[in-house]
């Protein structure tokens, strides 16, 4: 019979903890992927909230993967409230490093931005971002997916269009993404366990009555 080979085109290291907390293993994994998969460094993406340790290591290393940095706001105080465990870096410091790394790596930095209604979806965000923006950068935006019990909601279609227009007017390259499967809670950020209200089939040990 015939054989079919599917070649991986991109690998994203995301959702496994902050890479700067485990640099040796992350760099080893990137090197292994590139060596044995046949894809280039620019097809391996490290996702990070931004950390000086990672930034320093990337500049000093021969390994030059692509980089996706969680930004979510152009305003320092707001960004710290959205990412309370992120390293103490200003938006300006993050974007300055991004510009330097893009120049060395020869491919653009991706900045991640989850749009939240009434939080970070204002045109003022884009106006604050524009003076710091580099040509070798891409802004990836995706509206937040609503989750029961969470106050965070998606912006209206009209507000999303205003954001897109503000990006165009300020020379910011925008890739706008939307999420599928929201109707079945299968979108990004919606996969989670719900507490069962009914009594579990297996009772905790302290509730079991054992007759001897």
Regions found by a protein language model. Give the residues of each.
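Short, small-residue-biased leader/transition segments that mark boundaries at the very start
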Residues: 1-6
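Conserved AdoMet/S-adenosylmethionine-binding subsite of the radical SAM
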Residues: 7-170, 174
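Radical SAM enzyme core and accessory elements
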Residues: 169, 181-212
């Amino acid at each position: 019979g015939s054989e079919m080979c599917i070649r991986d085109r991109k690998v994203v290291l995301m959702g496994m903890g902050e890479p700067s907390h485990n640099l040796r293993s992350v760099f080893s994994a990137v090197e292994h992927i590139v060596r044995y998969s046949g894809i280039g460094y620019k097809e391996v993406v490290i996702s990070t909230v931004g950390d000086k340790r990672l930034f320093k290591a990337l500049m000093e290393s021969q390994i030059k993967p692509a980089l996706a940095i969680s930004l979510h706001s152009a305003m320092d105080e707001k960004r710290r409230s959205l990412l309370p465990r992120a390293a103490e870096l200003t938006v300006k410091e993050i974007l300055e490093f991004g510009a330097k790394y893009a120049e060395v790596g020869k491919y653009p930095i991706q900045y991640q931005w989850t749009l939240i209604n009434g939080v970070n979806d204002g045109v003022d965000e884009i106006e604050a971002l524009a003076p710091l923006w580099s040509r070798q950068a891409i802004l990836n935006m995706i509206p937040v997916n609503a989750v029961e019990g969470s106050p965070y909601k998606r912006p209206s279609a009209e507000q999303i269009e205003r954001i897109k227009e503000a990006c165009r007017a300020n020379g910011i390259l925008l890739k706008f993404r939307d999420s599928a499967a929201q109707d079945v809670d299968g979108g990004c950020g919606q996969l989670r366990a719900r507490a069962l209200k009914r009594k579990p089939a297996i009772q905790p040990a302290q509730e079991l009555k054992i007759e001897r």
